[in-house]
Amino acid sequence: MEFEMYLKNSGIEFLKDHPLKEFTTFKIGGKARYIVFPKSTKQLIEILTLAKDEAINYIVVGNCSNVLVSDKGYNGAIITTVKIDSFKIDGNLIEAECGAMLSHVARKACEAGLKGLEFAVGIPGTVGGAVYMNAGAYDGEIKDVFERAEVLDENLNPVELGRADMRFSYRNSRLKEEKMVLLRAVFCLKFADREDISPLQKANEFSKRRREKQPLSYPSAGSVFKRPPNNFAGKLIEDAGLKGYRIGGACISEKHAGFIINLGDAKAEDVRKLIYLAQKSVYEKFGILLEPEIQFIGEFETPLFVPVDGQNRR
């Protein structure tokens, strides 16, 4: 196959028919036909172009920190950007490639006395995934510091987008809506004033809060559901009596009910069943439909919950 020959001849690292669970923070997932590790945006574009020309299904991922991969795996190419990871700080601007780890970029920004990314120090995803999802925590979001980005549109044409072009909303962006791929992004931060709490101190406080409230000692994909308006998914799930509920090797965390954790041998279907149960229970008790925040890769036996009336009651 031309795709595989190109990878070999170009010296691009790849794995064939390899379990994805080795690369997801959930430690769950079947085999992918290919897992590819480009080292530059040039290689990334070439790989995507060839995959498209050969009609090979593909998905671009970062650190796989916000995904649930099917037990059946993925019949296509998983292209991970984690080796496209350079970034630089120039004054109050940060330019970062798609695979740079957001937490590392954010910490370096804090160390440089820049404020705006303190919330991101504990987020385990890449810059690409963070912009794609408009990642956020502790009242901060990527859209607050985003300046511009170079992306590939659905036809793999390079496009530069500014803040107004991105259509950011809660855990959403134009990249997600139009299946665009981020190559690099520029963030505009502010220098901390002398009377401010230092950005690093603030980031460390957020990290401490995460350790205290989140089940970080178990594999997971972070918050499973988006936050409903004027509420909290974890609280709703807890109030529905599901905290600690277990199916197979997956469990709704006792520490934070907004997390589903892998106790060691969880299957993707175990997680999907818990997601369905949480959605159904919360909807029946409170009339609120929880929307998954995590992304799903592959085919699943267990569906997501769909209310009979087809919409939220409130």
UniProtKB/Swiss-Prot annotation:
> Its GO biological process terms?
cell division; cell wall organization; peptidoglycan biosynthetic process; regulation of cell shape
Quote the PROSITE patterns the UniProt record gives: FAD_PCMH
**What GO terms are given for molecular function?**
FAD binding; UDP-N-acetylmuramate dehydrogenase activity
InterPro entries xref list = FAD-bd_PCMH (IPR016166), FAD-bd_PCMH-like_sf (IPR036318), FAD-bd_PCMH_sub1 (IPR016167), FAD-bd_PCMH_sub2 (IPR016169), MurB (IPR003170), MurB_C (IPR011601), MurB_C_sf (IPR036635), Oxid_FAD_bind_N (IPR006094)
Name the SUPFAM superfamilies for this protein.
Answer: FAD-binding/transporter-associated domain-like, Uridine diphospho-N-Acetylenolpyruvylglucosamine reductase, MurB, C-terminal domain
Q: What is its EC number?
A: 1.3.1.98
Tell me which residues this entry annotates as catalytic: 171, 223 (proton donor), 293
UniProt catalytic activity: UDP-N-acetyl-alpha-D-muramate + NADP(+) = UDP-N-acetyl-3-O-(1-carboxyvinyl)-alpha-D-glucosamine + NADPH + H(+)
Can you list the GO cellular component terms from the UniProt entry? Answer: cytosol
Required cofactor(s): FAD
What are the FAD-binding PCMH-type domain coordinates in residue numbering? 27-192
Top-tier EC class: oxidoreductase
Principal localization? cytoplasm
Does the record carry Cell cycle as a key word? yes
Family indicated by similarity:
Belongs to the MurB family.
Protein name (Swiss-Prot/TrEMBL): UDP-N-acetylenolpyruvoylglucosamine reductase
The organism named in the record is: Caldicellulosiruptor bescii (strain ATCC BAA-1888 / DSM 6725 / KCTC 15123 / Z-1320) (Anaerocellum thermophilum)
What taxonomic lineage is listed for the species of origin? Answer: Bacteria, Bacillati, Bacillota, Bacillota incertae sedis, Caldicellulosiruptorales
- The gene is murB
